[in-house]
């Protein structure tokens, strides 16, 4: 893998004996293990991932390792973001301290707390974003928030990702006249 990010933006460290990669940048630091079949080296400004042969498993692991390291570099330099929106009459969100408070038609408000690595940004009453440096963690947190009230297929009410298309169903057919 050839990483094109500048060396002065982030610091990287590879421990070949423990099969770990550590990346530090302005948005934090991330560590990751990689498969023992792969070889990861730092050469100048680049992180180089090589595979021992062209077997299917080695090719798959090569792409996985390269992508994971790339996501780590992007995460510590730029960060990741998932934008979500709320649709439905009376549904809304607000931020109280470090908690996201969701009013979703339940008898009680649903509260979701920020973590050390995940931040929540509320744009308005119907739009909010999940921010962080770890792509997997941001996606998992966004999925957990979305699961509090996923979009239903009849009216489309619920929490959805911005740009997500929800397949709508037709309601009950009326009695024939």
What are these regions (language model features)?
Residues 163-177:
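Short, low-order "capping/linker" segments at domain edges
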Residues 124-157:
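Mixed-charge, glycine-accented linear interaction segment located at domain edges/termini
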Residues 52-135:
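Extended, positively charged loop/linker patches that create polyanion-binding surfaces
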Residues 7, 16-41:
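A positional/architectural concept
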Residues 12-14, 38-42, 91-93, 119-120:
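A structural signal for short hydrophobic beta-strand segments in well-ordered beta-sheet cores
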Residues 1-10:
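Single conserved hydrophobic/aromatic residue that forms the stacking wall/gate
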Residues 36, 42-59:
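Short, charge-patterned binding micro-sites
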